UniProtKB/Swiss-Prot annotation:
Its EC number is 6.3.1.5. Deamido-NAD(+) binds at residues 138, 171, 178, 258-259. The lineage of its organism: Bacteria, Bacillati, Bacillota, Bacilli, Bacillales. This is NH(3)-dependent NAD(+) synthetase. Pathway: Cofactor biosynthesis; NAD(+) biosynthesis; NAD(+) from deamido-NAD(+) (ammonia route): step 1/1. The gene is nadE.
């Protein structure tokens, strides 16, 4: 088995999917898991990007089905901007599409800036822009878990195969979640699910960005990765990609393994 095949297997990627069937399986997963845990529903941060839009709509479909079947579940969608988000219109469009039971907005700027200032005062140096970006992601995680803990809700994560293979998420930030309904999907497969669900194409054709950096607001994921999502998707779906691209992907996969594991102990061997 080639490394490419090993990665596809580890990340549960199927080269070809039926979007309608995938929606059904993932909604069922959300329903089954929330019932098993005894939780009262879900909470998820909504950015206006493809991934949170898809996960949010799946979550809302799941809780509606639970209620229609005589159960009780709710979904809270959370906007978590840092000051003014340039693509706020997209976030609002996503919320209109998702139709969450409840929506709430938290501007994380005061919390992030207070921490950043305290860090500088105590340690005598400013946070790097990259590290501050990770703080933003982790404050968003803290906010979602506070809402979840207060209301008995599970925190949904938006990680999918194209992010997982590169480790392109903040450890204990957007990587901190209770369940991952998009696992195994490539970026283009996620788009196909949104198309099947009837989303406005603006929500899945827009340039993906983590938008964590003050110095480079709205920087494209592909710019930061040095790899396009089409290349990542081709690789994950078992297609041939240029050798240098495959090497970049495989290197990122190897060095980011710790992000896909629980914290290491001396009894684990995945890190050796």
């Amino acid at each position: 088995m080639t490394l490419q095949e090993q990665i596809m297997k580890a990340l549960h990627v199927q080269p070809v999917i039926d979007p309608k069937a995938e929606i059904r399986k993932r909604v069922d997963f959300l329903k089954d898991y929330v019932k098993k845990t005894g939780a009262k529903g879900f909470v998820l941060g909504i950015s206006g990007g493809q991934d949170s839009t898809l996960a949010g709509r799946l979550a809302q479909l799941a809780v509606e089905e639970i209620r229609n079947e005589g159960g009780n579940a709710t979904f809270i969608a959370v906007r978590l901007p840092y000051k003014v988000q340039k693509d706020e219109d997209d976030a609002q469009l996503a919320l209109q599409f998702i139709q969450a039971d409840q929506s709430v907005a938290f501007d994380i700027a005061s919390t992030v800036d207070a921490f950043s200032n305290q860090y500088e005062n105590l340690l005598g140096e400013s946070l790097t822009d990259f590290n501050k970006g990770n703080v933003k992601a982790r404050i968003r995680m803290v906010t979602q878990y506070a809402i979840g803990g207060q209301n008995g809700l599970l925190v949904i994560g938006t990680d999918h195969a194209a992010e997982a293979v590169t480790g392109f998420f903040t450890k204990f930030g957007d990587g901190g979640a209770d369940l991952l309904p998009l696992t195994g999907l490539t970026k283009r497969q996620g788009r196909a699910l949104l198309q099947e669900l009837g989303a406005d194409e603006r929500l899945y054709l827009k340039m993906p960005t983590a938008d964590l950096l003050d110095e480079k607001p709205g920087q494209a994921d592909e710019t930061e990765l040095g790899i396009t999502y089409d290349q990542l998707d081709d690789y994950l779906e078992g297609k041939a990609v240029p050798t240098d691209v495959a090497e970049k992907i495989e290197k990122r996969y190897t060095v980011s393994e710790h992000k896909r594991q629980v914290p290491a102990s001396m009894f684990d061997d995945w890190w050796k």
